Every structure is written in C-alpha cells, then in structure tokens.
C-alpha cells in the first residue's frame, strides 16, 4: 500500500501506527473537550475524532429503543442530549489545531 500524508505525518504499511482517539460526543462543553484533547496529546495520539449529528436527522420523537436497559427515554431524547453545536465544534477544532493534533468528525447523515 502506498503511504499517504495526514497533516505532515505519513500513514501506511511501512509507517509507525497512526492512533486516532474516538471522543465522539463525550463532551458537553469546551472545558471537557479541552481535557480530552490535552489527554490525547499527552499520550501521543495522532488524531481525535468526534461525531456530528442532529437528533432530528437520525430518529423521530416517537422512536424508542428495543432494549430493557434503556428505560423510557426515546432515541430522540438521548441523541438530542449528545448533540454538539456547530459553535462548540469550531471551538474544539481551533483548540485541537492550536495543540497540533489532527481533528476530524464522522458525520452521521449528510
């Protein structure tokens, strides 16, 4: 496989392992996101990834989980709690860039 370059780091079969930390939507504010990014930088992670979605685009308000341990919360309510605003995404992206770590997002729906 041919190597590719991600933010000045070669990635490929003959290159050192490229580590990506999944931070998903595990943060609710900028301070929590900074802590996660700082931890990733401290242990030598190459990139962090979060998730971009809006509850309205992936479920309905009347859609419930089909599992016993989820209680009575709807999928919409749960996903709504996990949304990350565009403003917070920009703050987090700017901070990651300043810290020198690659950041990207996995969009749920386009």
What do these predicted ranges mean?
Residues 19-23, 48-50, 103-105:
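Hydrophobic faces of well-ordered beta-strands that scaffold small-molecule active sites
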Residues 69-110:
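Active-site beta->alpha loop and helix N-cap motifs at the rims of alpha/beta catalytic domains
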Residues 46-83:
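Glycine-rich, proline-tolerant flexible connector loops at the mouths of alpha/beta enzymes
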């Amino acid at each position: 496989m041919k190597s590719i370059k991600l933010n000045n780091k070669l990635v490929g079969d003959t290159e050192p392992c490229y580590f990506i930390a999944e931070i998903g939507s595990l943060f609710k504010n900028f301070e929590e996101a900074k802590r996660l990014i700082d931890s990733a930088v401290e242990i030598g992670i190459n990139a962090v990834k979060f998730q971009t979605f809006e509850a309205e685009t992936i479920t309905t308000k009347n859609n419930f989980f089909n599992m016993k341990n989820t209680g009575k919360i709807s999928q919409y309510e749960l996903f709504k709690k996990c949304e990350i605003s565009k403003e917070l995404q920009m703050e987090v992206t700017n901070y990651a860039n300043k810290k020198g770590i690659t950041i990207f997002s996995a969009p749920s729906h386009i």
